[in-house]
């Protein structure tokens, strides 16, 4: 793969997980909060995971965090003002959850050393144009598969890692992110992401 310079992030090494604002993605949340994935995150040197889990999913998110064995903690992370964010601790790993963030791309730009995202094109673009390493998790429960087609095509071009909502696949992708460097998104996105997607789909 082509190499790209990774920007140095200040503060705790953070992975930002975005599940989409409107439709919850339980499979991705389940995978992220699995103890094996949390352990892999710690093994990869992360000390904080921020999870944007979507509206209407707060109670279930808190239940799953508790089931993983995390304990409630104070939330003092920057950039989350007005998000009603809550924090937990799991063996030294800080877990922060919130339903929605109005400036998700900005949060990714300032906080993320790695992004784990659902396969919505907007979220993919948020991460790629910030030149962040990106793991895209395809929601197989959706009726159409255009998101999977886009994610797999971008993976083939070396821009991201595409997986299913599976604990083993996510843990494996996290490990790969420590060994591999992705190709940056070309300047073509400035002409409009729709044009870029059309171009990618027909290569």
UniProtKB/Swiss-Prot annotation:
Annotated coiled-coil segments of the chain: none
GO BP terms in the entry: dolichol-linked oligosaccharide biosynthetic process
Compartmental location: Endoplasmic reticulum
Major place of residence: endoplasmic reticulum
Any Pfam family the entry gives: Glyco_tran_28_C
SUPFAM superfamilies listed in its UniProt record: UDP-Glycosyltransferase/glycogen phosphorylase
Function: Involved in protein N-glycosylation. Essential for the second step of the dolichol-linked oligosaccharide pathway.
Family according to the record: Belongs to the glycosyltransferase 28 family.
Protein name, entry field: UDP-N-acetylglucosamine transferase subunit ALG13
Source species: Eremothecium gossypii (strain ATCC 10895 / CBS 109.51 / FGSC 9923 / NRRL Y-1056)
GN (gene name): ALG13
